[in-house]
A protein has these predicted regions:
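An anion-binding catalytic pocket shared by soluble metabolic enzymes
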Residues: 66-69
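A structured, charge-rich N-terminal accessory region that forms the first stable segment of a protein
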Residues: 59-62
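Accessory DNA-binding and partner-docking regions appended to nucleic-acid-acting proteins
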Residues: 5, 168, 188-414
């Protein structure tokens, strides 16, 4: 299907998307000075169109998920590429971005944008919108193909954006990431309105703005691939100590922990705890040029575990957090009645989802479905009250409750 795009974009074809190779107006120069930032602020403040934003990080290379480049575009002003390593405080831009923000998968980027001093006043997320109109592929490039008939090359998504200077080809890619967001906003907004789902989208955007960044889970070392095969408490103690040491070193040298020592090496060491330095160095990853610099710290970690009594070692099973719900695959073993209820809830939600042409997880999040099913309902309470209360407690939006409350209650017989 041919698509007559606006904003100076070429005509698209959803059956044969045209690849967008260059940003309109060319690739902007990187802003890395205070003077350049203030100039950008004045320019953005003159615009009246929505604000398209994106963030590039260096995950897998640096420790954590700090932003290294922020891209901003207003159709009536142009695009800006801002080096947030050189300019970690972008709050001077705030007066010029007091309009609706356009993001794709906003939960990835909002924490970084807040980190650099920017706060949204309103939001439109093109990924959320794509899900609500029934698209089955949600990546930015896929949405652009399906809605605009235009293609984007996603070849630097996992690059090390902390390198300086940034290659010109990477900057072109970064500018293209905000090139199509405004046209997507116009077209997806129209579809949402035509389908009677604009209010659904507004509720989703408001919810996204209210989401707090996730806190680090306790005992993250237990989630390493292969950790479940370690049977001894001593081995688990070694895994915990090496993981914590790796975190400490990686944070100190600003390196992704997996680049310092791979997860598999930690698990291997914990499966057969090395009694001495020679045994530890027999594991290839620990004698790499980087990891070997910290051999004394690795050995201190091992020695600290060797000095622990059995009672001081980690338990074989991860401690259950109060109020936590087990993984669904464990339900049949733990509580067959809860497993049966989950099947009923899932079936009811899937039926509703099919009737409106959406994925079940869009109609009601899996964690909400699990919360509905895990504990028995109180038979003394009025029909449906407890189900609705549980939905609200777990963050279901009004439109989701309106769609699913009665079908779920009917399925559960309440």
């Amino acid at each position: 299907m041919l698509v007559n795009n606006g904003g100076g974009l070429p005509q698209g074809d959803t059956d044969n998307p045209e690849l967008i190779a260059q940003p309109r107006g060319g690739t902007p120069a990187v802003i890395d000075t205070r003077e350049g930032l203030e100039k950008a602020s004045r320019a953005l403040a003159q615009g009246s169109t929505p604000i398209a934003l994106d963030v590039e990080r260096a995950q897998g290379f640096r420790y954590g998920s700090d932003p290294y480049l922020v891209q901003i575009r207003r159709e009536d002003v142009g695009s800006f590429l801002i080096d947030t390593h050189a300019l970690p405080d972008l709050s001077v831009l705030q007066p010029g971005v007091e309009d609706v923000w356009l993001l794709h998968d906003c939960l990835q980027d909002l924490p970084n944008l807040r980190q650099v001093g920017l706060r949204p006043s309103a939001l439109f997320d093109t990924e959320i919108a794509a899900r609500l109109v029934g698209l089955e592929r949600f990546g930015l490039a896929a949405v652009a193909e399906q809605v605009l008939g235009l293609g984007l090359v996603k070849d630097h998504q996992a690059s090390d954006w902390s390198v300086r200077p940034l290659p010109k080809e990477w900057l072109r890619y970064a500018a293209l990431d905000v090139e199509l967001l405004t046209e997507l906003y116009y077209r997806l907004s129209k579809r949402l309105d035509q389908m009677g789902r604009w209010e659904w989208a507004q509720q989703e955007f408001a919810h996204a703005l209210s989401v707090e960044p996730p806190t680090a889970k306790p005992d993250r070392w237990r989630s390493l691939p292969g950790a479940g095969k370690i049977r001894s408490r001593r081995g688990l103690g070694v895994l915990k100590a090496l993981w914590e040491t790796r975190e400490s070193i990686a944070r100190r040298i600003d390196m992704s922990p997996g680049r310092l020592v791979r997860n598999a090496a930690l698990v291997r060491a914990a499966s057969n705890p090395p009694p001495n330095k020679r045994a530890l160095m027999s594991i290839n990853e620990f004698r790499s040029p980087i990891a070997r610099q910290y051999e004394d710290e690795w050995m201190r970690a091992l020695a600290s575990v060797a000095a622990l009594t059995e009672d001081e070692l980690p338990p074989k099973r991860k401690p259950v957090q109060p109020g936590s719900i087990p993984e669904p695959r464990q339900w049949v073993r733990i509580d067959e009645a809860s497993a049966a209820r989950l099947g009923i809830v899932r079936s009811a939600v899937a039926s509703v989802a099919a009737s409106v042409g959406l994925a079940p997880e869009v109609v009601l999040a899996p964690q909400v479905q699990r919360y509905l099913a895990w504990a028995p309902l109180d038979p003394s309470r009025p029909s449906g009250d407890e189900v609705e209360e549980r939905m609200v407690t777990r963050g279901a939006r009004d439109w989701q409750i309106d769609l699913t409350l009665d079908p779920v209650c009917d399925a559960l017989g309440v």
